[in-house]
Design a protein with these regions (language model features):
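Interdomain signal-transducing alpha-helices
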Residues: 106, 148-151
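A structural connector/turn signal
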Residues: 47, 52-53, 83, 125, ...
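Short, flexible domain-boundary/linker segments around small modular repeats
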Residues: 144-146, 153-158, 162-167
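Short amphipathic coiled-coil heptad-repeat segments
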Residues: 1-3, 160-188
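Sequence-specific dsDNA recognition surfaces
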Residues: 10-63
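A short glycine-rich beta-alpha junction/loop motif
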Residues: 86-91, 124-149
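Non-catalytic DNA-recognition/assembly elements of restriction-modification systems
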Residues: 1-20, 137, 145-149, 182-183
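A short beta-sheet element
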Residues: 56, 60-115, 131
Length: 188
């Protein structure tokens, strides 16, 4: 569209680098299967840091990018919109909005890039990673704010409809599976 600009992402999002220096922030977040989830900061299982002072403090409406192991992992989702204040590993890129933008719109845009595997050609190094300096050059659309919000709202509604259809189908499958088991039990 004529009113849309194409800009490097650094024009609309900067990097959020605010360390949890004194360990005061305790809401531990992680990117898992394309969703930012809460984790128990007091857990004893798995690989854990000795403290969380090096973790980044992130805010609602930031966007998280997991830029590691681009050459190996071509199935997981690497982007998500942050929905709450917390801390996350500094291995991730945390994008903070610079201007009046719809973070939901940019989440959907970056998610579409993620699904199309755009990030895989951007990394470098032995483990093929990506840093903010490289990521900042990524070209993105910049429509007017009202259009960003309209697109994000439309996608929110359509995605909610699809999620409801999926939930309904899962319920139908569970019902049919129960019927199948009952039928087998009755006739055997």
């Amino acid at each position: 569209p004529a009113k849309w600009a194409v800009l490097p992402i650094y024009c609309v999002y900067g990097e959020r680098k605010r360390k949890n220096v004194f360990g005061t922030e305790q809401n531990l977040l992680s990117l898992s299967y394309g969703k930012v989830i809460r984790k128990d900061i007091n857990t004893n299982g798995g690989l854990l840091p000795s403290n969380y002072n090096g973790y980044n403090i992130i805010e609602k409406n930031d966007i998280i990018i997991r830029p590691t192991d681009l050459q190996n992992d071509r199935t997981s989702l690497r982007t998500e919109l942050v929905k709450e204040h917390g801390i996350i590993t500094s291995a991730y890129i945390a994008l903070k909005p610079k201007n009046r933008v719809s973070s939901k719109f940019y989440h959907y845009l970056l998610h579409s890039y993620d699904v199309k595997k755009v990030f895989y050609n951007m990394g470098n190094g032995v483990r093929q990673g990506l840093n903010y300096g490289e990521f900042a050059k990524l070209m993105v659309y910049y429509p007017p704010l009202d259009e960003q919000q309209e697109i994000a709202d439309y996608l929110d509604n359509k995605c909610a409809e699809i999620e409801q259809i999926i939930a309904d189908k899962k319920t139908q499958i569970e019902t049919l599976d129960g019927y199948k088991k009952s039928l087998i039990y009755e006739y055997v």
